[in-house]
Structures are given as structure tokens and as C-alpha cells.
Amino acid sequence: MLVMLQFSKYQGLGNDFLLIDGREDQLTQQVINPDPAWVRKICDRHFGIGADGLILALPPRADGDLRMQIFNADGSLAEMCGNGIRCLTRFLADIEGDLCVQRWNIETLAGIICPVLQEDGQICVDMGTPFLDPESIPTTLTIGSAGLPQGECHLGSTSLHVAAVGMGNPHLIVPVEDLENIPFENWGQRLEKHHAFPAKTNVHFLKIHSPNQLEIRVWERGSGPTLACGTGACASLVATCLLGLSDDHAEVLLPGGVLQISWPGRRGSVFMTGPAEPIFDGVLTPLLSPSHAEVLPQDDQII
């Protein structure tokens, strides 16, 4: 008999995720520590369900209400994802209904993250303090006069002025004059794997419209082009703030919509506010279930 896995699909500004609830410790190790090939299969938009990543809601290991484990579409483990944690928050609120607590302490590989469901349905997330130390990001770029890692990345004959910020995961910010007329995919995939980032990096091409309005195009580590990146929007504001190019709060325009990002006083936590919405619920067919997730009791079991 095969284990039938229930899942839900959610999106935040078009950044979409498959969510599986394992808070009762009911998931097998083949789901909790999955084969990357299985994650790639279910995230495939032609042969699977299709998503930018997989999120597992798991029992806490420390003082959190639960633990989030997130995998990129290529099967690699991610430290944190801003749009993903908003989707998880909306998922939890939908499950709990009228008993919804409105606030959760969620354990991630980037530390405890605290999202709050607001009355208007938007989700405000305390994303924690940005990492500006090169070793913590990690990057080999060195600290510049603005107090964050800066430098040049060379792509053949092209030299790009860049900055780096960590939000529990690495981000490379590349200011450009025109977002539409850059070799986006070529630069994105090359910068993701640039030698200045030993753990690879998320890449954000940034245009500054005003001190209170930024626009970015996103190339996510392990996923490629996506419609939005919450941690990337936070990192972009931190970088422009320190470089004197923006205020400590701004709306960030992404292909999938708008996030409100603030870094009060340019110290402490960065806050991200934005939406997340359900798309559908489903059950994985046997062909999409983990290869070892076979057999439990006498009947097919939905968990």
C-alpha cells in the first residue's frame, strides 16, 4: 500500500510553494529528508505539480511553535524564504480558522522568525537583523565605506558594481539603469554561482525609482527566475539604505506585486508586509510520492 500525501499550494506575489503539514510528527523520513530528485519532480511544472519550492511544517526543536523546512525547486535545502514564510503563515491561519492565534514563532535555519496575520489579511513578518559581515553571508566581498560588503563582479568584459546582504540566506544586489534591457538570465545564472559566493547566492537586479520606491527582478538560488523574493526585497532595502539611496522604508516592486519593507532607524530587525493566498489542496498520486514512502497499514492512508 502507498502513503498518500496531502498537500496545499499557496502563492505570495506569484512565488508559489507546495506545503505539507507534519506538525504531528506523522511524516516519514523520506518526506522530512527528501531525495532532491523527488523535490525536483513534484516542483516540475510539466511532469509534477509545479512550484518554486516545497515547505514542510514540522514539530519545533526548541522554543518555537513549529519548524519550517524549505527546499528550492532544484531539491536543495534553503535557510529561509520571505514569501514562503508568508505562505506558511496563511496556511496555518486557514487550518486553524477561528482559533487562529494571529502570531507564530517559527523556527528556521535563519533563526526564529515571527510573522503576524493582520486584520486586513496582510502578513507582517519580523525578518530579523540583516547580516553584513562577509563571513556570515557568506561572501569574499569586503566591507566598503557604507558598512556592507561591496565590490565588482566581472562577467567577461562586463564589470558590475554590486553589494551583498545576508537575511539568513545570501543576496547579491546589482543596481542597474534599465531592468528590461539587461541579459537577465545570462547574468542571473552566472552571478548565482559566482566565486565570490561560496554557497551560491540569490541575485537581485535593482532599479531605484525614488527613495521610497525600489524595483527588482529576481534570480533565486536553486530556482532561477521567480516573480518575487521576500528576503531579497529586504536585502535590497538594507543595501540601498546603507548606500544612501533610499529611506528606511519603501515599497518594493516585483514582477508578482508589491511588498512594503521597513528597517526602522537602520538598525535591528527588518519588517516585510505583503499578501499570501491559497491556490488549491490536493493529494499526491502514487507516481509523485517519495519512492520509499510505501506501506503502512492495510488500507491506503492519507496523512
Curated annotation (Swiss-Prot):
Residue positions binding substrate: 15, 72, 82-83, 169, 202, 220-221, 230-231
Site feature: Could be important to modulate the pK values of the two catalytic cysteine residues: 171, 220
GO cellular component, one term: cytosol
Gene3D superfamilies the UniProt entry points to: Diaminopimelate Epimerase, Chain A, domain 1
Organism: Prochlorococcus marinus (strain MIT 9313)
Underlying gene: dapF
Physiological role: Catalyzes the stereoinversion of LL-2,6-diaminopimelate (L,L-DAP) to meso-diaminopimelate (meso-DAP), a precursor of L-lysine and an essential component of the bacterial peptidoglycan.
BP GO annotations: lysine biosynthetic process via diaminopimelate
Recorded family membership: Belongs to the diaminopimelate epimerase family.
Disulfide bonds: none
Catalysed conversion reaction: (2S,6S)-2,6-diaminopimelate = meso-2,6-diaminopimelate
Single Gene Ontology MF annotation: diaminopimelate epimerase activity
Keyword Isomerase (UniProt): yes
The name this protein goes by in its record: Diaminopimelate epimerase
Active site residues according to the UniProt entry: 81 (proton donor), 229 (proton acceptor)
Pathway field: Amino-acid biosynthesis; L-lysine biosynthesis via DAP pathway; DL-2,6-diaminopimelate from LL-2,6-diaminopimelate: step 1/1
